Amino acid sequence: MAHPEQHYLDLLAQVLARGDRRVDRTGVGTLSLFGAMLRFDLSKGAAPILTTKKVYWKTAVKEMLWFLTGGTNIRPLLQQNVRIWTDWPLAAYRRATGEEIGQAEFEARIVADEGFAARWGDLGPVYGKQWRRWLGPDGREHDQIAGLIETLRTNPASRRMLFHAWNVAEVGQMALPPCHMVYQYHVTSDGRLNALLYQRSVDLLLGAPFNFVGAAALQLMIAQQADLLPGELVWVGGDTHLYLNHLEQAREQISRAPRDWPRMQLVRRAESIDDYRIEDFAVEGYESHPAIAAEVAV
């Protein structure tokens, strides 16, 4: 049986071989395939943390925990040394002010100055806002995560167990429209929680490895809250692409042999979905190839 990571490497190879060359929003350009699927079995504790390059799994989990707070400002992320969202507010600040501020200085000002952070560190109504505080037409806010967990507990055969972040009325106010858009859940007859993540847009080299980890961590948390066991994580990509400045890095990654996947587990039972911390996650046996550097396209 093929190593589960091999399917990801095969997808990289397919994009390199058959991808449609396109000019994209960022101006960098991509090779793109439309429609992809990967399946990861979480039932035995293995976690989809890629081994053919180093993936900073704690950063991905911290991002997921931040989403669950409903927050939209990068300041709490930077306070935990998570810098993956800085590029968008930094670019907005430079455009608005004309100041050629460096990333490190911008981040330091966000952390040190709450007022500056409030003005320049907010991303608009992105993931957390939609997941936890979706604004209805009557002015009421809807907590999609709480509703999902309640349905898992009370009606696990439901086919309506999902949440999403594509709020048409607010997409234009977001620093970046949601890429990992829809999360749907399914409970098997033997009490396992399956998840399906649909991404409309997939940065296959940089973004997808983080999305795999974040979705798996979320699945563990939701399963625990609903007294279920983790099952399968199904990942579906829409526009699945490699940026043209990532092609050599993709070839380097494909050349590497996957190693055994690590195990991820929760070390305590949290009282609620809002009570998880990064210290609750333990990853054992993660031995990866070296990191592969690549620039984010903004």
UniProtKB/Swiss-Prot annotation:
Gene: thyA
Highest taxon in the source lineage: Bacteria
Stated family: Belongs to the thymidylate synthase family. Bacterial-type ThyA subfamily.
Record Pfam families: Thymidylat_synt
InterPro entries linked to this entry: Thymidate_synth/dCMP_Mease (IPR045097), Thymidate_synth/dCMP_Mease_dom (IPR023451), Thymidate_synth/dCMP_Mease_sf (IPR036926), Thymidylate_synthase (IPR000398), Thymidylate_synthase_AS (IPR020940)
EC numbers on record: 2.1.1.45
Pathway: Pyrimidine metabolism; dTTP biosynthesis
Key word Chaperone present: no
Protein name per the record: Thymidylate synthase
Function text: Catalyzes the reductive methylation of 2'-deoxyuridine-5'-monophosphate (dUMP) to 2'-deoxythymidine-5'-monophosphate (dTMP) while utilizing 5,10-methylenetetrahydrofolate (mTHF) as the methyl donor and reductant in the reaction, yielding dihydrofolate (DHF) as a by-product. This enzymatic reaction provides an intracellular de novo source of dTMP, an essential precursor for DNA biosynthesis.
Reactions accelerated catalytically: dUMP + (6R)-5,10-methylene-5,6,7,8-tetrahydrofolate = 7,8-dihydrofolate + dTMP
Phylogenetic classification of the source organism: Bacteria, Pseudomonadati, Pseudomonadota, Alphaproteobacteria, Rhodobacterales
